[in-house]
């Protein structure tokens, strides 16, 4: 799988960023990032990993998008 580009249409549609702290989106809350999101497929992947929202792409573990769902 290849890394998701922030500039891609799919990433922009969900305001995806590689570094959550740079988000600036109204829904972003401090501490939220891909690695602690329910949609991140393998939390043991600490740098880049799969995401249910972006099939076939890798997202940054420290990234964020508007589909964020806190992992139980």
From Swiss-Prot:
Q: What molecular function does GO assign, one term? A: metal ion binding
Chain residues that bind [4Fe-4S] cluster: 34, 37, 51, 65
Record's keyword terms, sorted:
4Fe-4S, Electron transport, Iron, Iron-sulfur, Metal-binding, Transport
Single biological process term from Gene Ontology: aerobic electron transport chain
* Top-level taxon of the source organism: Bacteria
Return the InterPro entries for the record.
High_potential_FeS_prot (IPR000170), HIPIP_sf (IPR036369)
Residues with PTM N-carbamoylalanine: 1
Give the family per the record.
Answer: Belongs to the high-potential iron-sulfur protein (HiPIP) family.
**Binding partners and assembly:** Homodimer.
Describe the function of this protein.
Specific class of high-redox-potential 4Fe-4S ferredoxins. Functions in anaerobic electron transport in most purple and in some other photosynthetic bacteria and in at least one genus (Paracoccus) of halophilic, denitrifying bacteria.
In its UniProt entry, what is this protein called? Answer: High-potential iron-sulfur protein isozyme 1
